[in-house]
Amino acid sequence: MKKNLILLLFFLIASHSMYAQCWQSISAGYYHTIAIKSDGTLWAWGGNFAGQIGDDSTINKSLPVQIGMDNDWVKLAAGDYHNLAIKSNGTLWSWGSNYYGQLGDGTNINRLIPIQIGNSSNWSTIIAGDHHSLAINSNGQLWAWGRNNSGQLGNGNTINGNIPYQVGNDSNWQSIGAGYAHSIALKSNGTLWAWGSNFAGQLGNGNSTDSLLPIQIGLSSDWQSIDAEDYHSLAIKSNGTLWAWGWNNPAFFVNNGVDYLYIPTQIGTDNDWKSIKTGQYHAIALKLNNTLWSWGSGSYGQLAHGTNTHTYPPTQINNLANWQTITCGDLFTLAVNTDGNLWTSGNNISGQLGDGTTTDKTNLTQVNCTSLGLNNVQYKSISVFPNPTNDYINISNGINIEKIIITNVLGKIVFETTQHLSKVNVESFQSGIYILNIYINDKKYNIKFIKE
C-alpha cells in the first residue's frame, strides 16, 4: 500500500508539473495560433499552407505541436500567414508566408521553420500585420518590412521591402499595432501615431486619405495600449477608457449607426479597461479586475457567449475574474487564465482552436497542455488521434515504423510491438498521460497522449 501511495503521489506531482502554469504567451493569425509555454518552448497549431506552423511541413495541425527544441523564446506575433518571434538573447526570427517579404530575410521564399533575421540582438517588441511586419529595438527605434501597397511601412513610398527598414529617426517608440494595410504606434510620451491605408478612417486623423509617413492622431498624450486589425484600430487611455476608430459596419465596435469612424470614438463609459485585442469583426478586452469581455460579430462563436449572435455593448464572458492574457485570430478568441490554462472559442476550420477537432466552439474550450507534440526531432508525416482518447489511438501516415513502445510518466513500458500498426488499443490503460515512442530508421520520435 505504501508503495502504491508513493507511486500515486509521484504521478500526481508529474501530472501537475505538466499542467501547472503551462501557457505563457499567445498570438493568433488568420487560421493559426502560436504560443510560448512557461518553459520557453514554442508551439503552434491550425492552418499551415504556407508553413506558418513552423514544423517543416504544410500540413494543418489541430493540436499544439512543438517547434524545434529551443526553450529560450520570450515574445511572439502572428500575422495572417506568417510569424515573428524574439529569443531571450534579443535575436529576431520569422517563418511562414513570405510573398511580400514580410519575413525580412531578404527573399520572398516561404520558410517552413523559424529563421533568424539579420544579426542584431537588441529586438524588444514585435507585431505582425496581415502581410507586413513591425519591430522596435531596445533603442526605441521602429523598423518595418513586407507589403507596402498603401504605405503601411511608413517610409514615404509604396515599395515592398524584404528586409527591415527604419521608420524615421525617432527613438522613443514604445508599442505597435498592425492591420491589413495600416500601422499604429505609441511613443513613450503617450502620443498616438498611424500611417498606411485610411479608406475607413483607420488612421483616426479625421479623413480617409492614406498616409505614407507616421502622422499624429489628435493631440492627446495619455494613450496607454493599442491594437489594430483589418481596417480598424482600438486603444485604451491611461484613465482606463476604451476607444475605437475605422471600419464599424455593422456597428461591431461602436453602436452609433455609423459605418466609418474617422476619429477615436469612446466605447461606453467604463473606465476600468486593462488590455484590448481585436479580430476581424470582434474584440475582446480585460478589465482591471481580470474579468473577460467581448463584443462584435459572433457568427462563429468567437464571443464565447454560447451563441452565434452579435453582441453590443461589451458583455462579460462567464463570471470568472482570473484572466491574464488575451488575443484574437480573425474569427476566433484565445485567453489564458492566471493558472496558465489556455481557453479558445470561435472558428475552427483549420484546427486553430487546438482542441484536436475542426468544429467551431461557441463557449471557451480548454487546450490541453500535454498535447500531441513531437518533443524531439519532428516527423512531419505522422499524426496521432484522437488525443485525448478513451479506447484507441490511430497512427496515420506512419511510414516505415519499425517499433512502437508506450510508456507511462514513470517510464514503465505498458505496450510494445514490432508490428506495423495503424491503431493501438489502449482501453485497458489507466487514466493518465502516456508517451508513444515510434522508431523509424533507427530514430525515436516521442508523442504525448492522454488516456481519459
PLM regions with names:
Residues 1-22, 374, 387, 435, ...:
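Bacterial Sec-dependent N-terminal signal peptides
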Residues 19-49, 64-65, 294, 329, ...:
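An edge-strand/N-cap motif at the start of beta-rich repeat modules
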Residues 32, 45-63, 96-113, 146-163, ...:
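Short glycine/serine- and acidic-residue-enriched loop/turn motifs that recur at repeat junctions
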Residues 32-35, 44, 82-85, 94, ...:
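Conserved core positions of repeat-based scaffolds
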Residues 36, 86, 120, 136, ...:
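Hydrophobic loop/turn residues within beta-sheet-rich immunoglobulin-like superfamily modules
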Residues 38-42, 49, 63, 87-92, ...:
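Thr-biased low-complexity repeat/linker tracts and other Thr-enriched repetitive architectures
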Residues 360-373:
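A recurrent domain-boundary module in secreted/ectodomain proteins
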Residues 377-452:
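C-terminal outer-membrane/trafficking sorting elements
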